[in-house]
Amino acid sequence: MTQHVDDPSVQAAMNLRRLQPGDEAVLEAFLASHADSSMFIRANARRAGLSYNAEPYQAVYAARFHGDRMLGVAAHAWTGLVLLQAPEHAAELARTCTEFSRLPVRGLAGPAAQVREARAALKLDDAPTAVEGDEVLFALDLSDLVVPEALTRGAIVCRAPRPEERDTLCAWRIAYDVETLGATDSPESRQRAAGFLDAQIVDGNAWVALHEDAPVSLSAFNATLPDIVQLGGIYTPPALRGRGFARCAVAASLLAARERGASRAVLFTGNPNAVRTYEALGFARVGDYSIVLLR
């Protein structure tokens, strides 16, 4: 007979603790079983480990176990975001990881029901937000990618950004942050946007689409693993939208990921136009995802 976590005998065997170096394998095994909705937390842990020294990509992790089996995890990241993969313990883990970290909470991200539960537990339901709401989680096996005809015949060319394009792409990135993430156009937000873009370029995770030698769209990954990538920061200037440029940019970035060995891609969006773009490339809806960014 299968025992539920509410069973007293199961609860007696459960424990909650902060993750430490040495816990990487059990964390990876758990997150891999929820791969599509765990990209931020999984990629950060792989990149920065489980120590916390306020460095980029680091986080303070709290996890609930039953014996040696992980049941859920929350991570309070260096950015202030609480990242969740806690199907049954989101409230408890959100409270615990923030108590461990003592960092300010600047937002939450994860499966939508978990974010709602954690937000209530942290007493943030009435906090002012820049962004909030449920989005659709999409996934694609890269063997099923539908490549746009304009890309295959060379009408649109995609490649890594060049230094002389940085100013243009930085302007696009801040425009993306304002439009999508509720940012304000300020010197601080421009510096932050440029930093994110520069990191994506250095890591080989940004691609620019060109039409008649002029940049027309940007595709990027905001989390990567050897077998799976997550799209984020896709932007086409308003005057150039509706012409298939984003579709070509995204397809080119996914072809590059496939050549590197990735077999799957995920993303989340609530934008109806973006939904049409991704479905045309072969993406299918696999769940939901939510990001709450506090003001």
Segments (PLM) and residue ranges:
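Conserved GNAT-fold acetyl-CoA-binding loop/helix
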Residues: 31-48, 177-195
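Conserved GNAT acetyl-CoA-binding A-motif
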Residues: 102-112, 257-270
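Acyl-donor-binding surface of acyltransferase catalytic domains
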Residues: 2-5, 66-70, 77-154, 292
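Conserved acetyl-CoA-binding loop-helix of GNAT-fold acetyltransferases
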Residues: 89-96, 232-238, 242-259, 276, ...
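Conserved active-site alpha-helix within GNAT-family acetyltransferase domains
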Residues: 113-130, 247, 271-288
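A short beta-loop-alpha structural element at the N-terminal edge
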Residues: 11-29, 111, 157-171
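Conserved donor-binding loop and adjoining core beta-sheet/short helix segment
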Residues: 15-19, 29, 35, 43-107, ...
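A conserved beta-strand-loop-helix scaffold within acyl/acetyltransferase catalytic domains
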Residues: 46, 76-78, 184-234
